[in-house]
Amino acid sequence: MWLKTQLFVLAIAVIALLEVHAEPESNDNNELVVEEARGCADAYKSCNHPRTCCDGYNGYKRACICSGSNCKCKKSLREMAAAAFGR
């Protein structure tokens, strides 16, 4: 019985040791998440200071409009008109 208790305690210690040294968020998508955070945001997607808005249709600049703490990239009127009339 004493041997079983010692083996159980040893197993718990090894599991705890391996858990401490495990890499947090060590999945394949981690690089994609970091790259997406650095990139630009499309129209009607959330934006902030490090993540600016992408250029729109025909190179029109999009603005990051904030309402409280909710910031979204908005299309400009020129961009919407150019897309509607095919320019």
Swiss-Prot record:
Any GO MF annotation of the entry: toxin activity
Keyword Disulfide bond: yes
Disulfide bonds: C40-C54, C47-C64, C53-C73, C66-C71
Domain of life: Eukaryota
Gene Ontology cellular component list: extracellular region
Tissue specificity remark: Expressed by the venom gland.
Keyword terms of this UniProt record: Calcium channel impairing toxin, Disulfide bond, Ion channel impairing toxin, Knottin, Neurotoxin, Secreted, Signal, Toxin, Voltage-gated calcium channel impairing toxin
Signal peptide start-end: 1-22
Prodomain positions: 23-37, 75-87
Coiled coil: none
Localization: Secreted
Biological function: Antagonist of L-type calcium channels (Cav1/CACNA1).
The family this protein is said to belong to: Belongs to the neurotoxin 02 (plectoxin) family. 01 (Tx3) subfamily.
Domain remark in the UniProt entry: The presence of a 'disulfide through disulfide knot' structurally defines this protein as a knottin.
Protein name: U9-ctenitoxin-Pn1a
Lineage: Eukaryota, Metazoa, Ecdysozoa, Arthropoda, Chelicerata
